[in-house]
């Protein structure tokens, strides 16, 4: 095939992640002939990465609480998620031979825990349904005639599709495929796109050399993080450049907006959130004897070395000596350690992204109003959510909605 040849197909799905594969499944079940294109050598690279530590498919909390996790985008995502609910997602997984269970936190996982068995079963089903795959096909926009342009190992390729589903992801983990190159091509078509920003991301902190050399990679367990009126219990991890982890990610949206506007923001960490300031002061008032201060804190309050190191960092920043603080002041500090965040970690290290195609650019069928026949699903759209199964649920659900939208479009 020369570059002037155009391959004509029914439906092109661009992006072989959860949203794209789900759109392909819906389309194939509806009788459409589907080709899935992806720049990577194989499907769902980021999905597989997400499943390495346990594939959190969705969450079991009541649907109203679940939907509220999407914040400003809730109203626009309600129809899609109400049509493909967390219960529907669990039933879908079980139909693929991968039953699920609810963890202690309410999160839902496949019993196999990993993503690979589910993905293998899914790809096998899609192949049986007649879906074809074209890997190492990097989409580069449209030509003057509206044909899809791809760069492949064999050179440029043009594809004319009756309908297209774009499911190229956001801008996180670019090495796994979602590099956000699509932003420029859609912006050139007049599509309004909210700037992409890292979501569920760690933050930079100017740790002292002593602290980061000693405590890089150390967890802070059983803590509570607070910012404004929000407080989250969980864990965090000290990194060489700052702090990350589930509790940090839960507050990252609000923290990100302030740090991007003001250049810094203060996060407070409670190291012993189950104890009041008075209870802490009482325990700290016990004579220390000949113990080192760190040993005293370890025995009196079960503070880990990294927690004590964090207190030292805070005291030094205030120009004070930690061991010289009166029990009442130290008790207050232990449950309100101020950490100054100076920026987000790079988008490449973020779990997901905020921003994307604004919802006013699509109709109720997830079709771009300016580009009839072109539908969008997944993280390309302007929404964000915390970890806990909300990201995958919305990706799956918008994939279903886009697939259904294409079927209606082709049927009309």
Show which residues each predicted segment covers.
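Short hydrophobic core segments
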Residues: 12-14, 37, 139, 158-172, ...
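Glycine-rich loop(s) and the adjacent beta-strand/alpha-helix scaffold that form part
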Residues: 163-207
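N-terminal Rossmann-like FAD-binding beta1-loop-alpha1 element of flavoenzymes
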Residues: 10-36, 402-407
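A conserved short coil-to-beta-strand element within the FAD-binding core of flavoproteins
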Residues: 135-147
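Glycine-rich FAD pyrophosphate-binding loop
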Residues: 28-52
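Short beta-strand to alpha-helix junction loop
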Residues: 77-85, 105-124, 173-178, 205-208, ...
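A conserved FAD-binding loop/helix module that cradles the flavin
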Residues: 172-185, 189, 382-411
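Residue-level recognition of phosphate/Mg2+-coordinating polar/acidic sites
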Residues: 29-30, 42, 63-65, 82, ...
């Amino acid at each position: 095939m020369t570059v002037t040849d155009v391959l004509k197909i029914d439906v092109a799905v661009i992006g072989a992640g959860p949203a794209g594969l789900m759109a392909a499944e819906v389309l194939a079940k509806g009788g459409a002939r589907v080709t899935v294109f992806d720049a990577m050598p194989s499907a769902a690279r980021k999905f597989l990465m997400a499943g390495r530590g346990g594939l959190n498919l969705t969450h079991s909390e009541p649907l109203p609480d679940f939907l509220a996790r999407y914040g400003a985008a809730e109203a626009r995502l309600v129809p899609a998620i109400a049509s493909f609910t967390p219960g529907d997602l669990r039933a879908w997984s079980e139909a693929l031979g991968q039953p699920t269970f609810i963890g202690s936190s309410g999160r839902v996982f496949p019993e196999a825990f990993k993503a690979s068995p589910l993905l293998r079963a899914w790809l096998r089903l899609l192949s049986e349904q007649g879906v074809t795959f074209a890997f190492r096909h990097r989409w580069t926009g449209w030509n003057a005639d509206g044909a899809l342009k791809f760069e492949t190992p064999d050179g440029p390729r043009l594809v004319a599709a009756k309908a297209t589903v774009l499911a190229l992801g956001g801008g996180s983990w670019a090495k796994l495929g979602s590099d956000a190159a699509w932003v420029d091509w859609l912006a050139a078509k007049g599509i309004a796109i909210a700037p992409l920003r890292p979501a569920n991301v760690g933050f930079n902190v100017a740790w002292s050399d002593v602290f980061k050399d000693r405590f890089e990679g150390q967890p802070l367990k059983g803590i509570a993080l607070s910012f404004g009126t929000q407080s989250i219990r969980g864990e965090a991890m000290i990194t060489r450049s700052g702090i990350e982890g589930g509790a940090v990610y839960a507050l990252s949206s609000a923290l990100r907006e302030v740090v991007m506007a003001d250049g810094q923001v203060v996060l407070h960490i409670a190291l012993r959130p189950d104890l009041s300031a008075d209870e802490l002061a009482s325990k700290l008032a016990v004579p220390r004897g000949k113990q080192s201060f760190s040993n005293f804190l370890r025995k009196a309050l079960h503070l880990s070395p990294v927690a004590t190191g964090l207190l030292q960092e805070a005291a030094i920043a205030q120009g004070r000596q930690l061991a010289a603080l009166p029990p009442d002041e130290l008790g207050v500090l232990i449950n309100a350690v101020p950490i100054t965040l100076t920026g987000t970690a790079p988008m490449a290290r973020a779990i997901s992204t905020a921003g994307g195609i604004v919802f006013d650019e699509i109709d109720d069928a997830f079709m771009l109003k300016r580009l009839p026949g072109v539908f969008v699903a997944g993280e390309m759209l302007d929404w964000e959510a915390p970890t806990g199964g909300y990201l995958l649920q919305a990706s799956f659900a918008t994939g279903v909605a886009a697939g259904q939208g294409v079927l209606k479009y082709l049927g009309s």
